[in-house]
């Protein structure tokens, strides 16, 4: 966590932390970092996107960058456009799944991959420095390009089966820009599409933009009422996708990710798959069965993308529906992932519930322990020491993860709240609760010891 950048770019409440002035400084800093070039700027449907977009564009052009304004688009549309058109960088104005009073600014490199924490730290240093303006004839220019959505749609259709065989699909677009991509792609694939919340509206009147089960009741009911074959839901900027089975039931995050990993390794052969430290052990089981290898990363799509690039992974994803298909581009792509899942159902000729029934499911329990932010580093150092004294298989890529014969435990400080989170997965509910109680006690003792 930096001064301005969090786990997913610059993000916060508009008018409090995130202001047009800050957006201007961020735009100028990116322009200085790039030293010129051409940058695409996109935005989601939030009501304050226009003000922030104008400020970012002003900052970029004031540092000599040319700007292509691609309008209201999905985050993966921006990533795909930057990579396909050979631009130098991209800027997306979005707060993804956060409520409507939030917004954010996220930078993307020429491959459509999110800026790394190291790059973001450089941007922060530039933001806090004194920048000189260029000569009057060295300012950048702005052009509009409305073709970015078409570029994205066509790129997706190049990757999937286009014989939808009349499948009936319900798509919940969350009043976001996915309405311009996912329904279009699925209809081109030959599917019958029923759209929910498909009118762009930055107030998100249809539902909260985070696609979690409690926000998807309408989607589940509609799937059942229309006898649909699948339900699909995106977040506010469509870098994520989740699914509802033909039975109208929410498809488990980890089980879906495991299913996707298995299919990709079937198609591509044994290879590496990148997932974060919070992903289920069922993914390890499935990947091992296919002769592959799991690479664990910190939580966050930028870390998954970095592992894909560094380790040569054939796929990467997080259980929340953030999936990266490196053969296409390095940005998490909800519409592409949705089309990919529909293509899988077409090829298998079986419903999603039947495919998921083949994937084991293990109980997961979560707990939190209060811990002031200023104590977190020392508490986590002490937690690691205590756990190394008691356990052999320890991973510290993000927090402390303990691997056990019948499960795992992750102790990780929250990036947004004064809490330390404990996540436990085990082969039985009883064992999961037993491990939860044990590790909660360890963490509480460490907090108390540091406070003394």
UniProtKB/Swiss-Prot annotation:
Enzyme Commission no: 5.4.2.10
Keywords from the UniProt entry: Isomerase, Magnesium, Metal-binding, Phosphoprotein
Binding site for Mg(2+): 96, 235, 237, 239
PROSITE patterns hit by this protein: PGM_PMM
Pfam families in the cross-refs: PGM_PMM_I, PGM_PMM_II, PGM_PMM_III, PGM_PMM_IV
A GO molecular-function annotation: phosphoglucosamine mutase activity
Post-translational modification: Activated by phosphorylation.
KW Nucleotidyltransferase (keyword) present: no
Catalyzed reactions per annotation: alpha-D-glucosamine 1-phosphate = D-glucosamine 6-phosphate
UniProt enzyme class: isomerase
Organism superkingdom: Archaea
Required co-factors: Mg(2+)
Active site (catalytic residues): 96 (phosphoserine intermediate)
NCBIfam families assigned: Arch_GlmM
HAMAP family given in the database record: GlmM_A
Function: Catalyzes the conversion of glucosamine-6-phosphate to glucosamine-1-phosphate.
Family membership: Belongs to the phosphohexose mutase family.
The name this protein goes by in its record: Probable phosphoglucosamine mutase
Organism (species): Methanopyrus kandleri (strain AV19 / DSM 6324 / JCM 9639 / NBRC 100938)
């Amino acid at each position: 966590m930096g001064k301005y950048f969090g786990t997913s770019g610059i993000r916060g409440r508009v008018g409090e932390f995130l202001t047009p002035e800050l957006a201007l400084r961020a735009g100028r800093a990116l322009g200085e970092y790039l030293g010129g070039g051409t940058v695409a700027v996109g935005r989601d449907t939030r009501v304050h996107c226009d003000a922030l977009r104008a400020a970012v564009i002003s900052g970029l052009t004031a540092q000599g960058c040319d700007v292509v304004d691609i309008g209201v688009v999905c985050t993966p549309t921006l990533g795909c456009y930057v990579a396909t058109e050979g631009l130098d960088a991209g800027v997306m104005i979005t707060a993804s799944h956060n409520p409507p009073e939030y917004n954010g600014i996220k930078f993307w490199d020429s491959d459509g991959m999110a800026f790394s924490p190291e790059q973001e730290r450089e941007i922060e240093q530039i933001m806090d420095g004194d920048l000189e303006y260029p000569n009057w004839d060295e300012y950048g220019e702005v052009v509009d390009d409305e073709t970015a959505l078409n570029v994205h749609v066509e790129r997706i259709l190049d990757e999937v089966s286009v014989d939808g065989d009349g499948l009936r699909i319900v798509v919940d677009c969350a009043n976001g820009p996915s309405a311009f991509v996912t329904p279009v792609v699925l209809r081109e694939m030959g599917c019958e599409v029923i759209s929910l919340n498909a009118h762009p509206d930055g107030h998100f009147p249809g539902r909260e933009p985070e696609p979690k089960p409690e926000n998807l009741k309408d989607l589940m009911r509609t799937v059942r009422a229309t006898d649909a074959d699948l339900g699909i839901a995106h977040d506010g900027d469509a870098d994520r996708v989740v699914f509802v089975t033909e039975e109208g039931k929410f498809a488990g995050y980890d089980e879906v990710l495991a299913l996707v990993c298995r299919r990709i390794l079937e198609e591509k052969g044994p290879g590496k798959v990148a997932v974060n430290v919070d992903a289920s052990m069922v993914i390890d089981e499935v990947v091992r069965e296919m002769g592959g290898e799991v690479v664990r990363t910190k939580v966050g799509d930028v870390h998954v993308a970095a592992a894909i690039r560094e380790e040569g992974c054939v796929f990467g994803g997080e259980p929340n529906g953030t999936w990266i298909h490196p053969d296409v581009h390095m940005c998490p792509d909800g519409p592409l992932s949705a089309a990919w899942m529909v293509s899988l159902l077409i090829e298998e000729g079986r419903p999603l519930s039947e495919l998921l029934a083949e994937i084991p499911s293990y109980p997961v329990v979560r707990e939190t322990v209060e811990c002031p932010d200023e104590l977190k580093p020392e508490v986590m150092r002490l937690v690691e020491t205590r756990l190394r004294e008691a356990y052999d298989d320890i991973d510290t890529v993000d927090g402390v993860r303990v691997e056990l014969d019948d499960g795992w435990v992750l102790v990780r400080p929250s990036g947004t709240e004064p809490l330390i989170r404990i996540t436990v997965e085990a082969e039985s509910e009883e064992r999961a609760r037993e491990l939860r109680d044990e590790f909660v006690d360890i963490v509480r003792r460490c907090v108390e010891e540091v406070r003394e």
